[in-house]
């Protein structure tokens, strides 16, 4: 999950002449639009963290080729911002609950939810277009600093949870 440099190819695609999908930015002679792939790459690139944390369910990683029941997850610690960032992808057809347990923290280091960013579409093949450039964009919901023990991740959603943890190095 920590990527110091990333290259994504193909980057640009003209709407009247392209070789393959997905491309990050589509354009014609006058306009451009960010694709769904662009926003996913942006969410990862802007939330890399400094240390990778374990993300498991029932002791098994929520990663790899299989995930668990359509769930895939990663977690990182950002030492500069003093935040834990949890990213969860639910590729299944149903909403799923994810239990969040921050092992290894002192009781005084209760994680405070900062915000939740969700990226969702009911249609797996939908994308932004030149005529509708904001059909699918990340939605950010700020939080009041409350604790969050269980996250409800809708079907076909990429969700990112940022938690402030004071007193951790």
Which stretches of residues belong to each language-model region?
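Aromatic/acidic polysaccharide-binding cleft in carbohydrate-active enzymes
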Residues: 1-75, 80-82
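Conserved, mostly hydrophobic/aromatic
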Residues: 6, 41, 86, 116, ...
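Short, well-ordered beta-strand segments enriched in hydrophobic/aromatic residues
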Residues: 82-90
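C-terminal beta-sandwich/jelly-roll accessory domains of carbohydrate-active enzymes
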Residues: 56-70, 89-169
């Amino acid at each position: 999950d920590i990527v110091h440099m990333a290259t994504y190819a193909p980057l640009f695609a003209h709407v009247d002449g392209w070789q393959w999908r997905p491309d990050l930015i589509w354009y014609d002679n006058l306009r451009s639009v960010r694709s769904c792939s662009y926003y996913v790459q942006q969410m990862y690139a802007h939330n890399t963290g400094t240390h990778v944390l374990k993300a498991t369910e029932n002791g098994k990683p929520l990663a790899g080729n299989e995930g668990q029941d359509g769930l895939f997850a990663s977690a990182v610690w950002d030492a500069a911002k003093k935040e834990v960032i949890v990213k969860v992808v639910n590729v299944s057809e149903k909403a799923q609950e994810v239990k969040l347990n921050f092992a290894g923290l002192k009781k005084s280091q209760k994680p405070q939810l900062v915000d939740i960013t969700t990226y969702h579409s009911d249609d797996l093949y939908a994308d932004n277009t030149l005529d509708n450039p904001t059909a699918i964009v990340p939605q950010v919901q700020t939080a009041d600093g409350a604790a969050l023990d269980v996250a409800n991740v809708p079907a076909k959603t990429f969700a990112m949870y940022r938690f402030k943890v004071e007193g951790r190095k």
